């Protein structure tokens, strides 16, 4: 780590905050170099689903997004109420739906689970905003298999993860992106060991 170009002695610990006690000034620049390698976590309490990380970034499936604008008075639920005279047209509801398949398992090599994953770096976006599916400058290509029984539930949300032995379709290349760029997020995947 460097502050204003000078190395700072610090002992960062994974999963912990790093505190720098100093008097800060306008224009101070902090540079932090993080290890950037692929890793995987298994969620035993969530049907042995897996998540993939690239350094400090957790990855999500890249899902095309369909935006539907609605009148906020129609979509208000529970105790959501509008004040009399408020113009709801100035505060529309935007619902986001998947516009591409999202129900994939990850195909993982038994000996080297991340062997078939490929990191692709793209140009930084001209608007300096990397937090959208279209502008994210990092993608990871992987192999997935669709899981047809994993569907949107009756509330319009992603259904419960299927069992590991759920029927899966043919292998396909899929793209993962940093979670912060995805509005619709599948970040815990059923796995398919091959």
What are the roles of these predicted feature ranges?
Residues 17-19:
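Short, surface-exposed beta-strand/beta-hairpin micro-motifs centered on an aromatic residue
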Residues 2-3, 9-13, 22-25, 29-194:
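C-terminal beta-rich recognition modules with glycine/proline-rich loops and embedded aromatic residues
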């Amino acid at each position: 780590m460097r502050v204003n170009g000078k190395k700072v002695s610090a002992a960062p610990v994974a999963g912990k905050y790093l505190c720098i006690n100093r008097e800060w000034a306008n224009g101070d620049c902090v540079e932090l170099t993080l290890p950037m390698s692929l890793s995987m976590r298994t969620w035993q309490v969530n049907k042995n689903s897996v998540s993939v990380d690239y350094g400090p970034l957790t990855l999500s499936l890249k899902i095309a997004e369909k935006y539907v604008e609605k009148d906020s008075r129609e979509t208000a639920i529970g105790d959501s109420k509008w004040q009399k005279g408020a113009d709801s047209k100035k505060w529309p509801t935007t619902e986001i739906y998947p516009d591409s398949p999202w129900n994939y398992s990850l195909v993982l090599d038994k000996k080297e689970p991340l062997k078939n994953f490929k990191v692709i770096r793209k140009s930084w976006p001209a608007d300096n905003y990397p937090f959208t599916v279209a502008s994210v400058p990092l993608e990871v290509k992987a192999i997935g298999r669709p899981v047809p029984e994993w569907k949107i539930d009756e509330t319009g949300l992603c259904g419960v993860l299927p069992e590991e032995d759920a029927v899966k379709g043919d292998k396909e290349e899929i793209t993962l992106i940093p979670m912060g760029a995805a509005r619709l997020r599948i970040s815990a995947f059923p796995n398919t060991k091959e």
